[in-house]
Amino acid sequence: MADKLNEYVALIKTEIKKYSKKIFNSEIGQVISVADGIAKVSGLENALLNELIQFENNIQGIVLNLEQNTVGIALFGDYSSLREGSTAKRTHSVMKTPVGDVMLGRIVNALGEAIDGRGDIKATEYDQIEKIAPGVMKRKSVNQPLETGILTIDALFPIGKGQRELIVGDRQTGKTAIAIDTIINQKDKDVYCVYVAIGQKNSSVAQIVHQLEVNDSMKYTTVVCATASDSDSMVYLSPFTGITIAEYWLKKGKDVLIVFDDLSKHAVAYRTLSLLLKRPPGREAFPGDVFYLHSRLLERACKLNDENGGGSITALPIIETQAGDISAYIPTNVISITDGQLFMVSSLFNAGQRPAIQIGLSVSRVGSAAQTKAIKQQTGSLKLELAQYSELDSFSQFGSDLDENTKKVLEHGKRVMEMIKQPNGKPYSQVHEALFLFAINKAFIKFIPVDEIAKFKQRITEEFNGSHPLFKELSNKKEFTEDLESKTKTAFKMLVKRFISTLTDYDITKFGSIEELN
């Protein structure tokens, strides 16, 4: 009996040793007021900025204001059941979103929850949406081209992997079209894409998703969607969710393209939240930290050095201007943050020029280092020629007495403008772009009437298809060697002769001499 008792005592002692008492300090606050998506809560003295707060009925919010006795919390989703006196509980964690390859082909909201009707996202990894951007020593300079498939951009304003290139312009000038065409052109190029719809109409987002599906681009794309019907807190959060999803692939050494469409609506949503939180307004009623809002977002797009995986995030933020005013507060802020801008203008768009990029005000500050050599060789003076044409074109409208030189510049300019026209959803390969530029640079287009340029471009793509030996050689070498240039000249002379022979009422003496094509 004594043995049995000793055995029980030993067992109890062992169990006592195993026992560890954990005290959980759960801070619970009380809602003082709730209105317009903002809750004022007392009793959460130790709450952290950007901390996730859990309310009754599974309602969540994020801490944006820390005051002496209360905290200001932006609420997500339907908060209609929240009342004065409702409880609020600290989660001791910041906002996180699911990340990983499971996000590809999915449409998610600003919280990373699926909204495409294809079931929940079975993510195994989550990452916090607010992070410090990689430091200078983790980065390297941009040295690889991101092929947009848009001739004007790849030739004149090349974008490199890891660059931030702003697309700025009035509404209905083709800004989104450029971004979507760039996503479509990443097919089979091992580039992951994230499209962030910020404050867009539901119908517009549905149209964009349909366009991506038709072009088989959704398999490497994630769409983060905070539409006009969502709360301002969701709109505010969406770009940070998008860049966090992109950073997962960046860490894996992959290349990512992210589009923010558009940051003007993002700034307006942040202004609304700030005013509701009673923060002091500044210029155009925006809060004082609206610059930091966009700089901390766009600085997370970068090109990492090889020690850190060598991945990249290329960002295409979009800004909408009012009546072409790029000197407004938000446009100038984002221009100063980014590595260049493409300025879209209504006058060119209405005149039928697609893409409607104004050459004079657009620039790419770092992309030229990443430009393909074949394209670089052919674009030497193209920007200058187009700038001269633009100036002379407006000048020539005032008088008809023009000297021969001016007439030549105008005629050449008209043909170049036709050559760089490009319909939506039809990106060009780098080889075809190089060949179009070759035709411009070596003045083969002077033999073609202006209204026949579009057909001539079509003829170039048909003639120099994937099986053509010149196409293969240029695709492999990625530059015009002396021998390749000579072969290409000969091929173009034959092509131009064949093309002009099909034209009716064509007189070569109006354009040049036949000897130039022999």
Swiss-Prot record:
One GO CC term, this protein: plasma membrane
What EC number(s) has UniProt assigned to this enzyme? 7.1.2.2
Q: GO biological process annotations for this chain's record?
A: proton motive force-driven ATP synthesis
Write down the Pfam families for this protein, in alphabetical order: ATP-synt_ab (PF00006), ATP-synt_ab_C (PF00306), ATP-synt_ab_N (PF02874)
| Predominant cellular place of this UniProt entry's protein | membrane
User: Which residues of this UniProt protein bind ATP?
Assistant: G169, D170, R171, Q172, T173, G174, K175, T176
Primary enzyme class: translocase
Family designation: Belongs to the ATPase alpha/beta chains family.
The annotated site for Required for activity falls at: S362
Query: Which reactions appear under catalytic activity for this entry?
Result: ATP + H2O + 4 H(+)(in) = ADP + phosphate + 5 H(+)(out)
Cysteine-cysteine disulfides: none
- Record localization: Cell membrane
Q: What is this protein called?
A: ATP synthase subunit alpha
Q: How does it sit in the membrane?
A: Peripheral membrane protein
How is the subunit organization of this protein annotated in UniProt?
A: F-type ATPases have 2 components, CF(1) - the catalytic core - and CF(0) - the membrane proton channel. CF(1) has five subunits: alpha(3), beta(3), gamma(1), delta(1), epsilon(1). CF(0) has three main subunits: a(1), b(2) and c(9-12). The alpha and beta chains form an alternating ring which encloses part of the gamma chain. CF(1) is attached to CF(0) by a central stalk formed by the gamma and epsilon chains, while a peripheral stalk is formed by the delta and b chains.
Keywords associated with the record: ATP synthesis, ATP-binding, Cell membrane, CF(1), Hydrogen ion transport, Ion transport, Membrane, Nucleotide-binding, Translocase, Transport
Decide whether keyword Signal is in the record.
no
Function of the protein: Produces ATP from ADP in the presence of a proton gradient across the membrane. The alpha chain is a regulatory subunit.
Xref: HAMAP family: ATP_synth_alpha_bact
Tell me the Gene3D superfamilies matching this sequence. 2.40.30.20, ATP synthase alpha/beta chain, C-terminal domain, P-loop containing nucleotide triphosphate hydrolases
Give one GO molecular function term: proton-transporting ATP synthase activity, rotational mechanism
What is the organism of origin for this protein?
A: Mycoplasma genitalium (strain ATCC 33530 / DSM 19775 / NCTC 10195 / G37)
